[in-house]
């Protein structure tokens, strides 16, 4: 990250590497930033017009951590790809940080349906690298769990 300070604000630029609980090491997804929500939606429209709507893996939603609007797809090789809007570009350093708890569903998604189970369990393995079990026992609430509660 490149962090710069200006007028009591902090901005973070460049790339993010996010570590999440789960079996690993594995690659969960790569992400592409778009400047506006309309760009993310336009991408979904283009995918649909090309007959690729079924590649949508999770969507649409807004992450609690970062407040980014997102859609996830699968590329032709099965890797998960996210398109998302800006997130935490400007942070007021006087603002009290939010402490997110693993049991708080809003950290992953502020609104919309939870992700399907496969979203949490499927990821790309690295060649010749053994996969280890998760370090924390924090089972997610999945779409399947959510829908089971309705029946």
Question: Where do the PLM segments sit?
Answer:
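Single conserved hydrophobic/aromatic residue that forms the stacking wall/gate
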Residues: 1-12
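Long C-terminal interaction/binding lobes of large macromolecular proteins
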Residues: 24
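Aromatic/pi-system hotspot detector in well-structured domains
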Residues: 5, 15, 82
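Intrinsic, low-complexity N-terminal interaction/targeting segments
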Residues: 13-19
């Amino acid at each position: 990250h490149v962090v710069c300070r200006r007028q009591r604000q902090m901005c973070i630029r460049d790339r993010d590497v996010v570590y999440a609980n789960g079996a690993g090491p594995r690659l969960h997804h790569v992400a592409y930033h778009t400047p506006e929500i309309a760009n993310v939606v336009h991408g979904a429209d283009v995918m649909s017009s090309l007959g690729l709507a079924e590649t949508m893996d999770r969507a649409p939603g807004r992450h609690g951590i970062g407040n980014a609007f997102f859609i996830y797809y699968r590329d032709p090789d099965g890797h998960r790809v996210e398109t998302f809007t800006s997130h935490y570009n400007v942070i007021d350093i006087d603002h009290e940080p939010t402490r997110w708890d693993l049991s708080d569903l809003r950290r992953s998604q502020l609104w919309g349906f939870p992700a399907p189970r496969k979203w949490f369990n499927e990821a790309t393995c690295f060649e010749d690298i053994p996969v280890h079990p998760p370090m924390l026992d924090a089972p997610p609430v999945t779409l399947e769990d959510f829908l089971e509660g309705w029946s």
